[in-house]
Amino acid sequence: MANKGPSYGMSREVQSKIEKKYDEELEERLVEWIVMQCGPDVGRPDRGRLGFQVWLKNGVILSKLVNSLYPDGSKPVKVPENPPSMVFKQMEQVAQFLKAAEDYGVTKTDMFQTVDLFEGKDLAAVQRTLMALGSLAVTKNDGHYRGDPNWFMKKAQEHKREFTESQLQEGKHVIGLQMGSNRGASQAGMTGYGRPRQIIS
């Protein structure tokens, strides 16, 4: 907030480490995706962390982003006609985005806190949330994602296998590799090593 002073000592070190996690290349990719997903009317931010924060701070662009991943008629977040100017309304808009992102499938561990964006505490966490949202959109592949699919990693998906009863029976007769092998080198034809012990009395 406006009345929060600069941090010193240990707090400054912690804040500095958090700020180093912010990725400017990732910022460019996320801006490209948001503009492609929401349309050019969302504009573009000034380069850098402060521009990125100011661009997303009121929650309207984030709300448009998550709404664009749903089919028409089932948009989860109500986007106001005019961007909210009151602080609590902006924070409420961001909170609605976070709720919609969680409903979409983003895990709690990938979510940022509202203050991370609003006060600029941890913009890397904001990037993480947007990356997780993009990855889910690419993975779902339901036709609502717009942009380059290579911008985000596809999440691993379950791949169930069905076996017939005869295949399961055959599997019981296979010696697992953990048991060792019954082929290859053996001790057949080997004689004892060395000479026998000579005991002379």
Curated annotation (Swiss-Prot):
Residues of the Calponin-homology (CH) domain: 24-137
Matches recorded under SMART domains: CH (SM00033)
Pfam families, per the entry: Calponin (PF00402), CH (PF00307)
InterPro entries, sorted: Calponin-like, Calponin_repeat, CH_dom, CH_dom_sf, SM22_calponin
Calponin-like repeat start-end pairs: 175-200
Summary of the function given for this chain in its UniProt record: Actin cross-linking/gelling protein.
Name of the protein described by the UniProt record: Transgelin
Name of the coding gene: TAGLN
